[in-house]
UniProtKB/Swiss-Prot annotation:
GO terms for molecular function: rRNA binding; structural constituent of ribosome. It comes from the Bacteria. Belongs to the universal ribosomal protein uS4 family. GO terms for biological process: ribosomal small subunit biogenesis; translation. One of the primary rRNA binding proteins, it binds directly to 16S rRNA where it nucleates assembly of the body of the 30S subunit. Keywords: Ribonucleoprotein, Ribosomal protein, RNA-binding, rRNA-binding. This is Small ribosomal subunit protein uS4A. It comes from Psychromonas ingrahamii (strain DSM 17664 / CCUG 51855 / 37). Residues 96-156 form the S4 RNA-binding domain. The lineage of its organism: Bacteria, Pseudomonadati, Pseudomonadota, Gammaproteobacteria, Alteromonadales. One of its GO terms (cellular component) is small ribosomal subunit. Gene3D superfamilies: Ribosomal Protein S4 Delta 41, Chain A, domain 1, RNA-binding S4 domain. HAMAP family: Ribosomal_uS4_B (MF_01306_B). The gene is rpsD1. Pfam families: Ribosomal_S4 (PF00163), S4 (PF01479). InterPro entries: Ribosomal_uS4 (IPR022801), Ribosomal_uS4_bac-type (IPR005709), Ribosomal_uS4_CS (IPR018079), Ribosomal_uS4_N (IPR001912), S4_RNA-bd (IPR002942), S4_RNA-bd_sf (IPR036986).
Length: 206
C-alpha cells in the first residue's frame, strides 16, 4: 500500500479529529469543518456499526502516526506478544518510533516532516546516524540533530512552534543544542484521551 500524498486536512476531516498532520500554527477548526467528513453536508452523520467504529479508530491512529497498514498490524502483533496491556503496549511502540520522538522533541513541525529529517540522515541516536523512521527508541537514548543539519530553517521554525506547546513529560529537550533525551516510555495517562485503543484491539482480535 502506497503512502498517502493527498490533502492532509482531508484525513483529519475523515476521522473527525485533528490528526496533527499540519504544523499547528493555526487551529485546525479555522482551516476546515472538522466535524463534517468530506462529502458529508449538514449536521446528520451516518451511524456506524461496531465494526465501522473499530475500523475508523484504527485508521485514525494509523494516520496520526503515519504508519502503513502492514506496519500497523505488525505493531499490534508485537504488542500482543509483550507482557502487560496490549493496547498500552501498542501506543508505546508507536510513541517509541524515531520519527515520532523527533516530532515530540519539536525538531519537526509534523510527524511527516520528522520522518523526512530521519530519512535524510539529519538525526543522530546516541551519536550515530540513524535513517530508519521506525527505529525503536529506548529509554535514556539521546536524540540530536546533526551539526550540518542544524542550520536548516525548517528545524528552527519547528522549534518555535514547539515552544508554543507543552513538552511531553517523557522527553527532555535542549532546544539550543538541538538534542534531547527519551527519558522513559510514556504511560497511558500521558497520551491522548481521544484514542480508544481497545477498539483497535477488538478489530484485530477477530
Amino acid at each position: 500500500m502506497a503512502r498517502y500524498l493527498g490533502p492532509k486536512l482531508k484525513l483529519s476531516r475523515r476521522e473527525g479529529t485533528d490528526l496533527f498532520l499540519k504544523s499547528g500554527v493555526r487551529a485546525i477548526e479555522s482551516k476546515c469543518k472538522i466535524d463534517n467528513a468530506p462529502g458529508v453536508h449538514g449536521a446528520r452523520k451516518p451511524r456506524l456499526s461496531d465494526y465501522g467504529l473499530q475500523l475508523r479508530e484504527k485508521q485514525k491512529v494509523r494516520r496520526m502516526y503515519g504508519v502503513l497498514e502492514k506496519q500497523f498490524r505488525n505493531y499490534y502483533k508485537e504488542s500482543a506478544r509483550l507482557q502487560g496491556n496490549t493496547g498500552e503496549n501498542l501506543l508505546q511502540l508507536l510513541e517509541g518510533r524515531l520519527d515520532n520522538v523527533v516530532y515530540r522533541m519539536g525538531f519537526g513541525a509534523t510527524r511527516a516532516e520528522s520522518r523526512q529529517l530521519v530519512s535524510h540522515k539529519a538525526v543522530l541516536v546516541n551519536g550515530k546516524v540513524v535513517n530508519i523512521p521506525s527505529f525503536n527508541v529506548k529509554a535514556s537514548d539521546v536524540i540530536a540533530i546533526r551539526e550540518k543539519a542544524k542550520k536548516q530553517s525548517r528545524i528552527g521554525a519547528a522549534l518555535e512552534i514547539a515552544g508554543q506547546r507543552e513538552v511531553p513529560t517523557w522527553v527532555s529537550v535542549d532546544a539550543t543544542k538541538m538534542e534531547g533525551v527519551f527519558t522513559r516510555q510514556p504511560e497511558r495517562s500521558d497520551l491522548s484521551a481521544e484514542i480508544n485503543e481497545q477498539l483497535i484491539i477488538e478489530l484485530y482480535s477477530k
